[in-house]
Amino acid sequence: MANKNVLSEMDDLMAELGLVETTATPTSDQIKQPQQETAPTYLTYKDPNVSTGPGGDFRNLNDNNGGISRGPGLMSTGPGLVSTGPGLMSTGPGLMSKGPGLPNNSINNNISNNNGGGISSGPGLSFGVSSGVSSGVSSGVSSGVSSGVTLVAQNHLARQPSPPLNSQQQQQQQLPTYLDGVGTLQPISLAATTPDGRVVKANGPICGACGDMIIGVCTNALGRSYHPEHFVCTYCKLPFSGSFIEHEEKLYCENDYLELFSPRCFACIKPIEDTCINALGNRYHPECFSCSGCGDKLRGKPYKEEDGEVYCNTCKIARQKRLAAKSEICSKCKLPITGEYIILQGQPVHSEHYRCEECGCEFNVGKTCHEYEGRLYCYEDYQKQILNICGACSKPIVGRSITALGKVWHPEHFTCTTCQVPFAGSAFREHAGKPYCESHYHQFFGRQCFKCSKPVVDTGVEVFGKIYHREHFTCTGCECVLGKEIMEWDGKPLCFKCFDALPKEVRKRIKEKKAGDKKAEAYREKLAKKEAKELKKERERAAKEKEKESKAK
């Protein structure tokens, strides 16, 4: 009887605190609803004033020794069950939890045994006991004011729990999901902080389409990751049916890629998926490239072009004969004239032949042409043909002139590019199409004597990669003029007398080096001959292939 009074007191106090609702048992729809959320984890906060026993840690908030102690006989609370000793019945069915987001089916329905008694709770359960529980086996509930035990659900996205969500709000939540062991789709939750308050930073691949982080299932392609709903064709926005094609870092299905980027046949205007034929600046399907006369397929056969159409040789000849019988013949190309033509000097010519022989401009209405030596020129090119233009001032030359470097010059304008002094019949040198006097040519482009550092104008002596004036090619030791037989020491020429005066070890090293240089030179010559031989064979092979192609045409 005493136990019943204690239980009823606990129920009354819990109801006053708003911890117990006396509503009916939740429906099956309410129980299924939270299965699509991620169950949060729990933190039990320890305190030095908490006494522990089997089943859990508790916070003692009562200053008058009203805290909860844990004995081996304390029973756990399930849905609607509050027990104080072994074998006690529940005080009333239908206990509802007060925490945020509590799944109604998450409260433990089993009463623990005497040795494992602890308060078990589901996500979001906030449970308070109005009176402290005294120590001892099945001793029941003692008097005194105490806040009891509070178990708080840890929200993975914030330290404070959020208010309960209705069914519509729960459906609007969009969290990454996974399949649990029984095949149920469960949401994946991300912890924002650790139990000790440290910030947890999410880390995942970036979607190549939207740029957001991917949490959950992703699709990898071409070194990028995508949300499954974003791995679609760039053009039609439909998922790929097996394969895709990449173009300029964008993904397309095969049909859209062919429609957007494949070349199109000039004849049928349809995309070319496989082999194509390039002819007359256009592309064709092999089956569409046919003779305009007889319709035969021209793949692998010679053909001729006429007025933008292709013909086989037979149809080409037959067409020319038909046109020649009723058309004029061009006096320039000797071919029939089928369209517009011009009478030039009493002879018909194609209109495309009525143009300047030099610059190719057409003689349109109002533009006159000039004939010179049987050819037609515009006025500007005609003046160039009948007049000599100075290569320096670009003005006509009347009177004396100098012809040099493929141009005609006024005598006073044919000067050194550097000093502007006229050559007046003296010798000059050319570099990059420009004339230079001897001194400035050798100053800028000539080689200098290794000994006196002056340009070598005429012939010099070149040895050891250097050039000398003939009179400056002397022995480094005795300054005598050297002949053909010389020795080298440190890149400098020596006569035999000075060479023999060198130490024996030095002479030995010099001779070994000279022998090595000769051997290397011989090897380089051998390689050069081999390369020249291979180059000759390559040119002969290219000439043969070109000849075969010309015969095929």
Swiss-Prot record:
GO cellular component terms attached to this protein's record: cell cortex; cytoskeleton
Organism encoding this protein: Dictyostelium discoideum (Social amoeba)
Protein name: LIM domain-containing protein B
Region (Disordered): 43-115, 534-553
Classification lineage: Eukaryota, Amoebozoa, Evosea, Eumycetozoa, Dictyostelia
Subcellular location: Cytoplasm, Cell cortex; Cytoplasm, Cytoskeleton
Disruption phenotype: Cells exhibit an aberrant actin cytoskeleton and numerous F-actin-enriched microspikes. Cells aggregate poorly and aggregates arrest at the mound stage. They exhibit poor adhesion, form weak cell-cell agglomerates in suspension, do not polarize in chemoattractant gradient and move very poorly.
Stretches assigned to the LIM zinc-binding domain: 205-262, 263-322, 328-387, 388-447, 448-505
Keyword terms, alphabetized: Chemotaxis, Cytoplasm, Cytoskeleton, LIM domain, Metal-binding, Repeat, Zinc
